[in-house]
Amino acid sequence: MFLKKHKSKLLLVPRDEEQEDAGIVAVLTDRIPSVLLVRWFDLFCFGFAMCSYALDFFSDIGIAIFHFWAGRYLSGSLVLAFALLPSVIINIISMVWMLDDEMHWKRRAHPRRTGTFELNQKRFIPLSKMIVLCICQMGPLFWYYKALYYGWMFRKSSNENTDGEKRKCFSKMVEAERDATLLRFFEAFLESAPQLIIQGSIAASYFQNYYQTGTYPYWLYFQAASLLLSIISISWSVVVQNRSLRMIRDDKVNIWPHEAVLQFCWRFLTILARIITLVALVLIFGINVVPLISVHLLVTLVHVIFLQAIHIDACTHIEKLLLLINTFIHIFIPFNMVEGNTRWRYLTAYSVEFIEMMLVCWLLPLSLNTFPYIEKVQVGVPISFIAGIAIMMMYYQFFHPNRRQLIVTQSQEDLSLNVQKSVETLTPKLESSLEISGEQNTSQDLVSELLLDVEHEN
């Protein structure tokens, strides 16, 4: 268990060029489930992700403008910097992916993603519009919109199109969602999570200053709404990342809506407690919080190496990079980046968070004894954390998708036994019929056709 290397489930790295996702070939045969299903909940996830991304970004820009308008240039600069710099990085990556799709489209080759062309080989949208989207920092919305479009086309034409066309629509949808969720996941921890610490510290300081007057400036309400949107954005990005990975793998059971809601509640409550803890650390120690975060990173790096070591064939540098990314993510939330049992990983990571949270709650009265509602904060933060952990335990005990996988596996085994018995019964009859009729078809061909009929009937 300890120091054992596991396969990464955050990033699928091909061993060679032939293993790259081709959209038309590889994804259709290896990466998507045998039973294709697009629910209304899946389309809702795409739409909700688009709305939350846009609201989160523009709310941060609006808060920065409020600070500049009031003459708080340092606060405005910090908010704007942590909003724009990560967004520029994410949109550059998105633009590179779009250009990659455009290059493959022009060569009429199989692209690594089924990117900018529809089923009739036309562009999904013109390249000029893609560039405008990225300049406006809305590049990730392109991938969500494409996933939403092909998901809608799949549902709309389920009874009309052939199986091949439906599989193409499904593969385009899941590939677009894969790119979108990966971009959104990194955006959450490059922009939203650090932004929470910056804006939370600013809002807490001004809230304390204005508390005595009994009146609060209007921008403080907008900042509170922006903080709430950022927490929702981070929580949802983790949920949809997990859902997306399960959706495209035949060896995994997809997440049902109520399971996604439980995951969201678990993440939201634990992230809320964690962000308040980090903001309190900033208020108590100021710039001296950097060494404390460094100690946390060191502790996290140790248990991540022991419990979540990553193995990627012939990609040692990517292994190290993902290890560092996972360590950074653990500043804000525990995250399971590799295959395998999560029990010890979450137990260790959440234990570290709980110890840090209780130490901060114990230190709060000494340094922030004049902070409004300090007693309620001391009680509310642990309650939020414990409630989130309780939902997590309930999710893993009663609602985890793997509990349904056992039922699916058993039904598949029963189906295989029925098919095998049918073949054993029908083969002698087929052979005798072929001898009498003298037809050219072999018994193996007829058995194959009958197998499909038996599977369909079952």
From Swiss-Prot:
GO biological process, one term: programmed cell death
GO MF assignments: phospholipid scramblase activity
Disrupted-gene phenotype: Delayed cell death process.
Membrane topology: Multi-pass membrane protein
Extracellular side stretches: 67-77, 145-219, 317, 375-378
Site feature Cleavage, where: 21-22
Result of changing residue 163 to A: No defect in apoptosis during embryogenesis
GO-annotated cellular components: plasma membrane
Keywords linked to the UniProt accession: Apoptosis, Cell membrane, Membrane, Transmembrane, Transmembrane helix
Coiled-coil stretches noted in the UniProt entry, renumbered to this chain: none
InterPro entries with a match to the protein in the record: XK-rel, XK-related_scramblase
Maturation and modification: Cleavage by ced-3 activates ced-8 function in promoting phosphatidylserine exposure at the surface of apoptotic cells.
All ranges on the Cytoplasmic side of the membrane: 1-45, 99-123, 241-274, 339-353, 400-458
Annotated consequence of substituting residue 21 to E: Loss of ced-3-mediated cleavage. Reduced phosphatidylserine cell surface exposure in apoptotic cells. Reduced number of cell corpses at the comma stage followed by an increase at the 4-fold stage
Residue ranges crossing the lipid bilayer per the database entry: 46-66, 78-98, 124-144, 220-240, 275-295, 296-316, 318-338, 354-374, 379-399
Catalytic activity line of the entry: a 1,2-diacyl-sn-glycero-3-phospho-L-serine(in) = a 1,2-diacyl-sn-glycero-3-phospho-L-serine(out)
Cellular location(s): Cell membrane
Record family assignment: Belongs to the XK family.
Function: Phospholipid scramblase that acts downstream of ced-9 and caspase ced-3 to promote phosphatidylserine exposure on apoptotic cell surface. Phosphatidylserine is a specific marker only present at the surface of apoptotic cells and acts as a specific signal for engulfment. Regulates apoptosis kinetics during embryonic development. Not required for engulfment of germ cell corpses.
Annotated protein name in UniProt: Cell death abnormality protein 8
Organism: Caenorhabditis elegans
Lineage summary: Eukaryota, Metazoa, Ecdysozoa, Nematoda, Chromadorea
Gene that produces this protein: ced-8
